[in-house]
Each structure stands twice: as C-alpha cells, then as structure tokens.
Swiss-Prot record:
NCBIfam families: 1-(5-phosphoribosyl)-5-[(5-phosphoribosylamino)methylideneamino]imidazole-4-carboxamide isomerase (TIGR00007)
Protein name: 1-(5-phosphoribosyl)-5-[(5-phosphoribosylamino)methylideneamino] imidazole-4-carboxamide isomerase
Gene that this sequence comes from: hisA
Organism taxonomic ancestry: Bacteria, Pseudomonadati, Pseudomonadota, Gammaproteobacteria, Lysobacterales
Example GO biological process: L-tryptophan biosynthetic process
Pathway: Amino-acid biosynthesis; L-histidine biosynthesis; L-histidine from 5-phospho-alpha-D-ribose 1-diphosphate: step 4/9
C-alpha cells in the first residue's frame, strides 16, 4: 500500500486553529499563515493535505474555495477538504476550486442516499466520507454531527458497512476523544473497522503524536493518517512522518487509494 500522510490545517475565521475533542470553546489559535504552512507541507515531501472549514462545519456553506485555489496552484498539493458540505452544488464548487477529494461528514450521516448518489456521479475517488465518532458508556461508537454538537441515531459500524456496500472507497474516521489531545490514535477502532470493511481505504485521525503512531497506522493496514496538532506544535517532523509512511511493506493488504489522474472539472455532471 502507498500509505498517505495528510498534514492538516483546520481554519476558523481565517486562522489556523485546533479544537480539543471537537469543542469550539476549547480552541488554540496559531496564526493566519495558511499558504506558507501548506507550502511547508509540500517542501517536507507531502503530496496531500487535509483542509477543514470549521466555520462551515458548524454553520454550513463551505467558505474556503478561494484559499483552496491558492493552495493547489501554489504548492501542487492534492487536497481533500470539507466542512459544511450540504449540497451537490457545494461538491461541484469545491471540486472546481481544485480539490482532489471532497470530505463529507454530517450529511453522510444524515442523508446517506444523497451521498451515495454523489459517489456514483463524481466517482469514489472524489469523495471521502468522514465519520467522527465517540464511544458511549455502553461501548457503542456513536456519530456526533454538525460540528460535533449533536449525536445521530445511526452507529459507526452500521454506516461503515452500508457505505462499503455502496462502493465507498475512502473513509476518514476520527475518534473525537483523542482529537487534539496528543494521546495517540485509538487503534482499536481502526482495527475493528479494517476487519468490518476491508475493501475501504481507511484514514486514521485524532491523537497522532509521533512517528510511532504513523507506523502503527500503516502496520494496521490503514491507507493513511491525518496529522494536525503534533505538526503545529513541532512535536513531529512532517518529513520524518512522510519517510516512515512511505517505507515499503510487503505485507500491505490493500492497493493505494492515492489519486494518480489529473483533477477533473464537474460543471457538466
């Protein structure tokens, strides 16, 4: 597998921020140097990045299209991005702005039929379903939505299997309890998902702190890992993470989910 390291930037009010456990009241603001940070990702060997519109995740209406255009044109990075994607027009607009994949979160939980239609229309390489999860007292993996302010009735295992059956290729799963905490990813949930939906390319998100976490995600058979706070706070060197992620492993169980063809435009879809 060609394991992908996704350096991440979460944007709120034009600034790079991080939330702790998805709580908008527990925010750390870093700076407004989004484009220089993206260029630094590319200079460190990253080929992809993960870009999140936190304002839109809460209120709807993706707002980062101009910034996305700047990033893709200036850096050559392939970008998967989301936050507040509520309609087909949102998907088209984001793809036309240069995204390689559109990340769909809350809507993927609330309106599965709609998202499956987009998978068929735009192709499974253009859609990443993001299931942000939190384990309840009974051990069930629940799915908070709308900026993690509400909890859906559906559960992680059920939705993952339904999307896999519909042809989903890219699934990003965030354990909210680990997000922004630098406590290491909860590999139990990813191992569980790998066994449950083995044909899906699984991305690890939440808690990554060092190279060992990158290696653990790769060895678990995941397709990639999203790195946020550890990079922003200088605890992890992206170049080193990319190097460890790219080491060949003859036991890799799945082919690469990395995009190889040029990004298309979808006005005619």
């Amino acid at each position: 597998m060609n394991f992908i390291v996704y350096p991440a930037l979460d944007i709120r009010n034009g600034a790079v921020v991080r939330l702790q456990q998805g709580d908008y009241a527990r925010q750390t603001r870093y700076d407004d140097q989004v484009l220089p940070r993206a260029q630094a990702f590319a200079d460190s060997g990253a080929t992809w990045m993960h870009l999140v519109d936190l304002d839109a995740a809460k209120a709807g209406g993706y707002t980062l299209a101009p910034l996305l255009r700047q990033i893709t044109r200036a850096t050559g990075l392939q970008v998967q991005t989301g936050g507040g994607v509520r309609s087909r027009d949102d998907v088209v607009r984001i793809l036309d702005a240069g995204a390689a994949r559109v990340v769909i979160g809350s809507l993927a939980v609330r309106q599965m039929a709609c998202v499956i239609e987009w998978l068929q229309a735009f192709g499974p390489e253009r859609i990443t379903v993001a299931l942000d999860t939190r384990q309840d007292a009974g051990g069930v993996w629940r799915l908070p939505v709308h900026g993690w302010t509400e909890v859906a009735e559906a559960t992680l295992d059920v939705l993952a299997q339904q999307y896999a059956a519909a042809g989903l290729r890219h699934l990003l799963c965030t354990d909210i309890a680990r997000d922004g905490m630098l406590s290491g990813p909860n590999m139990d949930v990813y191992t569980y998902l790998r066994a449950l939906v083995p044909a899906v390319q699984l991305q690890v998100s939440g808690g990554a702190r060092d190279v060992a976490d990158v290696v653990a995600a790769k060895m678990a058979g995941c397709a990639g890992i999203v790195l946020g706070k550890a990079l922003l706070e200088g605890r992890l060197a992206l170049k080193e993470a990319v190097q460890h992620g790219s080491v060949a492993d003859p036991g890799d169980p799945l082919p690469c989910g990395e995009l190889t063809e040029p990004v298309c435009r979808y006005r005619s879809v």
